[in-house]
């Protein structure tokens, strides 16, 4: 167990030092649509680098990637980008990246085990990125490789509350035979948290992660929860998400008050090769001064989601990013990114 020393896991809307992307390449599952996914990553890189520093982990040559990006980004954006060459299995920085705590005196870089969402996919290269990257970053490195934890499986309000899902953290392919009580104790100790709120519903059809919180419920300022819900009784997910909504209404803040709930629409089903993909508007990315919202070529629902998210973040520009290529591999924008917070 770690001593607290005033460390905490900041909320994502707090000031960020930089953001990480892990770049797609031809030896990943992106190969059949590499041009399409590269376009999405270029769009993300542009919006990030306009507002904060960007770290790009890349298996391909940094020089060739820099040259390609310079054709699409301005000099000011390119000056904010740092490249780090490293072998990678895939691109999901949210789940293989560092989870970073801050205190008045510095940062703590928590390196957890990433096992491909319960050994579903090869992850040995991605699991080794942080140990290589640590030499280039400021902060105290903390080896937590004996515990499986993905960044997409937790949400923090920055004030001691962690929200997660039981279907993911209690999955037998993660930290078995640890009990729920043991896992909660580990989270509180490692993340310097006072309490952990567990959600038991809301698993998207097609989700490979066993129910990451960042696909269904997100924290926002002023004790606000943004969550997805279905209005279609014929949707196979309708009942599960109705149960999630009921559970959210029962949650209380640390001061005992109900959360402010903002309901996001459920995208119309997106089918690929006969299977439904886990499209969600909850997988947005918070930047300094902006929020990147995944869109799915559904003008009405895309606009509604952006409007609702804008209401939760009135001081930020709301930017839609076409994420139809990303969802082909069962993820979205938040899954592609990992923020490194600034020291207060």
What are these regions (language model features)?
Residues 1-344:
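The feature marks the mature, well-folded catalytic cores of soluble enzymes
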């Amino acid at each position: 167990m770690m001593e607290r020393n005033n460390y905490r896991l900041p909320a994502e809307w707090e000031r960020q030092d930089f953001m990480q992307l892990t770049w797609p390449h031809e030896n990943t599952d992106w190969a059949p649509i590499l041009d399409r996914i590269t376009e999405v990553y270029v769009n993300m890189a542009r919006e990030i680098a306009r507002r904060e520093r960007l770290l790009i982990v890349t298996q391909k040559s940094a020089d060739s990637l820099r040259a390609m990006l310079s054709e699409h980004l301005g000099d000011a954006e390119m000056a904010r980008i740092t490249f780090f060459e490293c072998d990678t299995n895939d691109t999901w920085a949210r789940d293989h990246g560092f989870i970073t705590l801050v205190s008045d005196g510095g940062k703590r870089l928590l390196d957890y085990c990433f096992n491909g969402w319960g050994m579903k996919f090869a992850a040995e290269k991605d699991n080794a990125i942080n140990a290589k990257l640590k030499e280039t970053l400021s902060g105290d490195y903390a080896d937590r490789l004996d515990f499986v934890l993905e960044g997409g499986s937790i949400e923090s309000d920055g004030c001691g509350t962690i929200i997660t899902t039981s279907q993911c953290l209690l999955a037998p392919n993660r930290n078995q035979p640890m009990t729920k009580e043991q896992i909660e104790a580990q989270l509180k100790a490692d993340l310097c948290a006072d309490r952990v709120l567990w959600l038991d519903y809301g698993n998207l059809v097609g989700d490979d992660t066993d129910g990451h919180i960042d696909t269904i419920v997100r924290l926002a300022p002023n004790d606000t929860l943004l969550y997805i819900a279905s209005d279609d009784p014929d949707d196979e997910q309708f009942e599960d998400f109705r149960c999630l909504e009921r559970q959210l209404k029962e949650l209380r803040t640390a001061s005992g008050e109900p959360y402010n709930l903002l309901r996001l629409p459920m995208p119309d089903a997106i089918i690929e090769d006969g299977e439904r993909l886990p499209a969600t508007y909850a997988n947005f990315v918070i930047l300094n001064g902006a929020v990147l919202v995944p869109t799915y070529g559904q003008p009405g629902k895309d606009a509604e989601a952006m409007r609702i998210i804008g209401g939760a973040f009135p001081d930020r520009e709301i930017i839609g990013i076409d994420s139809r290529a990303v969802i082909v591999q069962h993820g979205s924008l938040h899954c592609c990114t990992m923020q490194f917070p600034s020291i207060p």
